[in-house]
Amino acid sequence: MRISPSEAAMKLSLSPPPYADAPVVVLISGLGGSGSYWLPQLAVLVQEYQVVCYDQRGTGNNPDTLAEDYSIAQMAAELHQALVAAGIERYAVVGHALGALVGMQLALDYPASVTVLVSVNGWLRINAHTRRCFQVREQLLHSGGAQAWVEAQPLFLYPADWMAARAPRLEAEDALALAHFQGKNNLLRRLNALKRADFSHHADRIRCPVQIICASDDLLVPTACSSELHAALPDSQKMVMRYGGHACNVTDPETFNALLLNGLASLLHHREAAL
């Protein structure tokens, strides 16, 4: 992977195109903001696509102090600007949770650029259950700091049996997350942007084909959210994984990758046929 040479835009990590004019797929992670979230997908995606990963502004290798009114629209705009600066004007988007919200905003604001959208455990507007989960996590952050936030995070991401079988891995992930913690203020401003986002009155304007992937055992985002999203979009298909939790692409990459690869191939072909 190489780093985009643009100094004005966010740093992007781009894989070499596997062939001339290969489609571009942009991977957008959730609230954690790290491009490394998609490691279980990279090896299969780079065989067919030029893949773009990045750490979101205010996280990882794109450090910044975010404004109090930071928004999903700003996240979409700065990503699109970075892609254009890297010479990428048309791209498919795969977004997880917050990343799916950014993907929808991109599809609304830059319809000529977004060819296909894949929403993974996303939603139209935050569900009361999801809001409750984040309220608990915020209380942990305020009372116990970054360590409490990080240690509680796997409970919302992974199935219990998956975690129980991987205690050493989770300890290592906790240590890494603490070492690269985005900071309390940035985290809360990104979380507030997520909570304010509401696509319930705009989703019908998204014209690109959308693949919706959700997990039936997601503790953080009920599958009803994906059903509502599916009903609101003009052109979408929904796939439900029986197992995997909120981070189903990490816990069951074999099932997830098959759904993703088939969906991208089908929807990109569908898009080309419609042009």
From Swiss-Prot:
Principal EC category: hydrolase
Keyword Oxidoreductase: no
Cross-referenced Gene3D superfamilies: alpha/beta hydrolase
Keyword Phosphoprotein: no
Any one of the GO BP annotations: uracil catabolic process
Enzyme Commission designation: 3.5.1.-
InterPro entries attached to this UniProt entry: AB_hydrolase_1 (IPR000073), AB_hydrolase_fold (IPR029058), AB_hydrolase_sf (IPR050266), Pyrimidine_utilisation_RutD (IPR019913)
GO MF annotation terms: hydrolase activity, acting on carbon-nitrogen (but not peptide) bonds, in linear amides
One matching Pfam family: Abhydrolase_1
Reaction(s) catalysed by this chain's protein: carbamate + 2 H(+) = NH4(+) + CO2
Keywords annotated in UniProt: Hydrolase
Superkingdom of the organism of origin: Bacteria
Family in the record: Belongs to the AB hydrolase superfamily. Hydrolase RutD family.
Entry function: Involved in pyrimidine catabolism. May facilitate the hydrolysis of carbamate, a reaction that can also occur spontaneously.
Protein name: Putative carbamate hydrolase RutD
Organism expressing this protein natively: Escherichia coli (strain UTI89 / UPEC)
